[in-house]
Amino acid sequence: WHFGYKAHIGADTDTGLIHTLETTAGNVSDVSMTSKLLTGTEEEVNGDAGYVGANKRKDAITRNKFGKKIKYRICRRPSTLKKLSRSGQYKARKAEYRKSSVRCKVEHVFGVVKNLFRCRKTRYRGKAKVDSQLKMVFALANLFLADTRYGLQA
């Protein structure tokens, strides 16, 4: 049998620390989890191409708790860049580079979890057990990242 799970995370762009974790089956799309990952205090949302159209969904959160409009900065799919003219491609690639430089903070957390804590494959069968394992590992990753970035001392 084959089974897989996804860890959808919401991370703070300033600190790079995780504030939300949702575990789903592997066949659940990223864009369907967007509203569950937001805390309500965001001013902008950054995501990869898997989140295209997140602001147009029925369950999309368009305003934060303070009434300000949330800016969705989602990377474009590479195939849409090929359709542009040469000068348009140059400008679009620069804009995509700026978006992905913010998004790399989230990807860095996944690198810590996979490489430092060796959490590459699921060790359990069942969503509840996998969810518990991922919450523990991501909490440890938060502690590790906070310690390396801010030098927290006991």
Residue ranges of each PLM-predicted region?
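Aspartic protease catalytic domain
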Residues: 135-144, 149
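Short, charged/polar low-complexity linear motifs in solvent-exposed/disordered segments
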Residues: 36-39, 129-130, 154
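Polybasic low-complexity intrinsically disordered regions
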Residues: 1-62, 68, 77, 137-141
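Helix-centered, glycine/charged polyanion-binding patches within enzymatic domains
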Residues: 43-44, 49-132
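Residue-level marker of positions within ordered structural domains that often coincide
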Residues: 14, 118, 144
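A short, flexible helix-boundary coil/loop motif
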Residues: 116, 149-154
